[in-house]
From Swiss-Prot:
HAMAP family the record matches: CobQ
Biological process per Gene Ontology, one example term: cobalamin biosynthetic process
Protein name: Cobyric acid synthase
The UniProt record lists the keyword Oxidoreductase: no
PANTHER family: COBYRIC ACID SYNTHASE, DETHIOBIOTIN SYNTHETASE
Length: 496
């Protein structure tokens, strides 16, 4: 039997669609249904390497985790990775298709939509339920003629739609009513009801507005969801970095992550950010490095452009000074490339920061793979042989001309090989390994090593492991949906 589809759309970006879909996946997977997530087109710089070496949006990987199934390219057949003014890299079914400007991409969509629809068909053939996520808003007038991420999906699948509004940013009633007004009649007919998300305060104060929404649209407000604090779950958009981070308390380890304009896969740092005794913040000014015990130079979608940005901001000198003071500096993926001696792309060779004996060249082929292995000996006092796993997504290939490896890694069916580079003197290191801090033992030992180097007393972690924290939070969202919307109500919308 073909799976039933329920779609979650929003009145804006960051309304909470991704986590609501994740919660629905967990809620119904716990009840024994075969569940799959779906998002036809996703725009994000935080991506994920699937077990078969393909690339999808990070949110769909999280939703697959919530559903208890392996992530697959059919869950996110089209991924757009912004590259700045040039447009976006289009990743089709997990493989890079090319970089397209908006006008060219709109013409391409006529060919892409059948492929996205076929991916949804394959998911429906193997599942009982598919929970689909929209993108942005379904009522953007300038985008509607080319929108294959919202109502086009719902109409194709005959899916009921939950429309989510973010009350935290204000204007939720106007946004819900305005969205309904701008939809075509056949699209409005698919909307089963509304969800007000991220509410803080006394829900009784909302009653008049909720009643008005119901009276004006003929659809109920299905539930009001509170703002959830302390979630250990991924976000996709760098807008999520606004206001992130905290000031260190006495005895905390202060970690500064450089907020590159084209930062990618900053989900790498969520395990550190949510660790007790660690104060992680995102910085973009040289003076903000002064109080840091360690600095991380993260991944970038455009390494050379972000390297030029570092130099314009004076952060190149600040990072060299930081390293010269014997403080730990770690580069991941694009950050690793920037720490090296040179970066070559086409006929252009650009000097790196010169802190690691590494030369990088960019190539057309892209490496996308899940890997596992162990730590190498002698890096910052971190013990060798610690289990670690993660993934690589990069187009550059680096030649290491000295130093020592950070890890010994292997992909599926391969032996362990040296990976990354740590300077022989000082505490500068770099790696292509995304997700290394998800590994509890490595993260704990990395924190302990940096605390020692900073002269801070040891502080054992008393938290559950990061994976356990994620599972707890997915259950927390599922429980909230069951409480605030109701399982019977959701079953009715699904036709169960």
């Amino acid at each position: 039997m073909t799976a039933r589809v329920l779609m979650v759309q929003g009145t804006s970006s960051s309304a909470g669609k991704s986590l609501i879909v994740a919660g629905l996946c967990r809620l119904y997977a716990r009840r024994g249904f075969r569940v799959a997530p779906f998002k036809s087109q996703n725009m994000a710089l935080n991506s994920y390497a699937t077990p078969d070496g393909r690339e999808i949006g990070r949110a769909q990987a999280l939703q697959a985790e919530a559903a208890g199934v392996p992530p697959h390219v059919d869950m996110n057949p089209i991924l757009l990775k912004p590259t700045g003014e040039a447009g976006s890299q289009v990743v089709l079914l997990g493989r890079p298709l090319g970089v397209y400007k908006p006008a060219n991409y709109y013409a391409l969509k006529e060919k892409l939509w059948p492929l996205a629809a076929a991916a949804l068909d394959r998911l429906r053939a193997d599942a009982d339920l598919v929970f689909a996520e929209g993108a942005g808003s379904p009522a953007e007038i300038n985008l509607r003629p080319h929108d294959i991420a919202n109502m086009e999906v719902a109409l194709y699948a005959g899916a009921s739609v939950l429309l989510v509004g973010d009350i935290e940013r204000g204007g939720v009633f106007a946004s819900l009513l305005g969205t309904m007004e701008l939809l075509a009649e056949r699209e409005r007919e698919l909307v089963a009801g509304f969800v007000v998300n991220k509410f803080r305060g006394d829900e009784e104060l909302l009653r008049p507005g909720l009643a008005l929404i119901g009276a004006r649209t003929g659809r109920p407000v299905l539930g009001v969801l509170p703002y959830l604090h302390d979630l250990h779950l991924d976000e996709e958009d760098s807008v999520g970095l606004s206001g992130r981070g905290k000031a260190p308390a006495p005895g905390d380890l202060a970690v500064a992550v450089i907020r590159l304009p084209r930062i990618s896969n900053y989900t790498d740092f969520l395990p550190l950010e949510t660790e007790n005794g660690v104060a992680l913040c995102y910085v973009d000014r040289p003076q903000e490095l002064d109080g840091a015990h360690a600095v991380i130079l993260p991944g970038s979608k455009e390494t050379l452009a972000d390297l030029a940005w570092l130099r314009r901001r004076g952060l190149d000198r600040a990072l060299r000074d930081f390293a010269a003071r014997g403080k730990p500096l770690l580069g991941i993926c694009g950050g690793f490339q920037m720490l090296g001696r040179t970066i070559r792309e086409g006929g252009q060779t650009v000097a790196g920061l010169g802190l690691l004996p590494v030369r990088t060249r960019f190539a057309s082929e892209k490496r996308t793979v899940q890997v596992r292995g162990v730590t190498a000996e002698g890096v910052w006092g971190i013990p060798g042989g610690l289990s670690v796993r993660g993934y690589e997504i990069h187009r550059g290939f680096s030649e290491v001309c000295g130093g020592r490896p950070c890890f010994l890694l292997g992909g599926q069916g391969t032996g362990l090989a040296p990976e990354g580079c740590a300077a022989e003197e000082g505490y500068v290191a770099g790696t292509y390994l995304h997700g290394c801090f998800d590994s509890d033992t490595y993260r704990t030992q990395w924190i302990a090593a940096v605390r020692r180097l900073a002269g801070l007393p040891a502080r054992p972690s008393e938290q559950p492991g990061f994976a356990a924290r994620r599972q707890r939070d997915l259950d927390r969202i599922a429980d909230l949906l069951a409480e605030r919307i109701g399982v019977e109500r959701l079953d009715g919308i699904l036709g169960l």
